[in-house]
Amino acid sequence: MASNGMASSPSSFFPPNFLLHMAQQQAAPPHDPQEHHHHHHHGHHHEQQQHHHHLGPPPPPPPHPHNPFLPSSAQCPSLQEFRGMAPMLGKRPMSYGDGGGGGDEVNGGGEDELSDDGSQAGEKKRRLNVEQVRTLEKNFELGNKLEPERKMQLARALGLQPRQVAIWFQNRRARWKTKQLEKDYDALKRQLDAVKAENDALLNHNKKLQAEIVALKGREAASELINLNKETEASCSNRSENSSEINLDISRTPPPDAAALDAAPTAHHHHHGGGGGGGGGGGMIPFYTSIARPASGGGVDIDQLLHSSSGGAGGPKMEHHGGGGNVQAASVDTASFGNLLCGVDEPPPFWPWPDHQHFH
């Protein structure tokens, strides 16, 4: 298996137009995979015998006129010697690849992999010194946006690559935005706290004003109620005084028909005693003096008087005597007569009592 690997490595390393490789392709019969599997299981010595048996000694290649580095037919090594050189040749690409990576690191191939401070990522990180950082900070304060000309000037002045300067400005701008957001947040939070405190103070003041308004309304309602009670008491007292004065006036003034009522029975009795013989044929007897019209008043209608006096018990009652034909009054209600005869303008149907005093 190792010999197969050594045999295949020169063909993959050298170009396909290599003369030895061409000679092997021309001389070698088609390779059987079963025989290759058989070689894999039987040792290196058996593998060499099988290769010699199938391949045979390769013919010497003719010298190549265009490639002086290739060996001639006399100097061409055998296949076994070439296989011995394959391990040494196989190690060359690996060392070359390592060397190429180191060259890229020296030449600054890892520009994209930079850390936050502008240094390269990897085993060898290049960090910026203090002077470079100060210069970049001053330029960042002048303007956080980096133009291409300015980037090239800074790179030449600081001995850095333009990509490093651009990445440093990008990271610095991100940190600046974060700090700016924190500052804005703190300022807005302070403003919010101040507004909340002011709002709480206004709410407390509003509550106090509402309480004062309620107290003032209660006082006004109480004062209005007190004034209304005073007015009611004053009106009630005025009414009571007026009623008491009316009662006193009524009690002090005597009834106007009391003297006439007292004198009426005496005069009637005198008239009845003096003219008993000639009074029988008169037929019409005048009423009492209480129904006489006042000096300034008018008369009363006889129909109205009789109608009102006939319905109640307060009217005058008259009795007829068979001997002399005289009429005698039994009882008279002074109040009803006063109410009936007040304000009547018609003349009385009979003569008043004082006009008939000549009968005595």
Curated annotation (Swiss-Prot):
Keywords: DNA-binding, Homeobox, Nucleus, Transcription, Transcription regulation. The keyword Secreted does not apply. It holds the Pfam family Homeodomain. GO terms for molecular function: DNA-binding transcription factor activity, RNA polymerase II-specific; sequence-specific DNA binding. InterPro entries: HD, HDZip_class_I_plant, Homeobox_CS, Homeodomain-like_sf, HTH_motif, Leu_zip_homeo. Residues 56-68 have a biased composition (Pro residues). Residues 121-180 bind DNA. GO terms for biological process: positive regulation of DNA-templated transcription. Probable transcription factor. This is Homeobox-leucine zipper protein HOX21. It comes from Oryza sativa subsp. indica (Rice). The gene is HOX21.
